[in-house]
Amino acid sequence: MTELGCFRVEKIKVIGVGPGGKDYLLPVAQKAIEEAEILVGGHRALALFNQLKKEKRVIDARLENVAAFLNQNKGKKVAVLVSGDPGLYSFLDYLLKHFGEEEIEVIPGLSPVQVAFARARMSWQDAVIISLHGREKEKMLACVVTPAVKESPKVALLTDQDMPPQKIAAYLLAQGVAQKIMLIGDNLSYPQERFVRASLAQVPQLKEQFDNCVVLITNG
């Protein structure tokens, strides 16, 4: 909480809720969420806390409306819930452009990238991490993903149904990338979690549909 003259203004708490499974939510995050008066987040993040009888606001494409809502509720305890960790491709950067650092508190969470590398039993300090969410995916494949895969021993991609692993693998193969392994973590930490390992050449033939996944591309 910060003080402005005689007013006391609550900090906006930006909280990483982890990959989605409740067992992967940090206790410090759980405590902050329970103490909050208002929860703000995407549908998937808010659904984790349906049992909490609190005011909830969904983050949609109109981000300026969310910023206005936060400004209107500066005197309340507001928790902004983001998937994974706030420091990795989240709503945090947008908030920092519209609010001062002193108005924001960040509570970390486990990223699905961390979970994917744990499932693969690999370290990831040398990995290149790229998000395809909300990007021009075809352009990203050509200009960012392909060079990274060619140059780096480990690449992690955050992707979804619009750019499934099969399509990524087919594109890379067409660019002459072949001697790589793809590991696909789908719905990580949820009961329906799947983790698939295949050569890049095998992936386009996979019949599974992947909904919300992390793709690791490593040397064979």
PLM ranges: what are they?
Residues 87-152, 206, 210:
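Class I SAM-dependent methyltransferase SAM-binding "motif I" and its flanking Rossmann-like core
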Residues 62-68, 112-113, 135-138, 189-192:
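A short acidic, often aromatic-flanked loop/helix-cap motif at beta-alpha or helix-coil junctions
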Residues 71-77, 119-122, 141-147, 194-202:
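Short, surface-exposed amphipathic charged segments that create phosphate/polyanion-binding patches used
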Residues 45-50, 137-138, 164-165, 191-193:
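Short, charged/polar "capping" segments at the starts of alpha-helices
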Residues 2-107, 114-115:
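Class I S-adenosyl-L-methionine
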Residues 42-43, 61, 84-85, 133, ...:
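Structural motif
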Residues 10-14, 78, 149-220:
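A contiguous loop/helix-start segment that scaffolds small-molecule binding in enzyme catalytic cores
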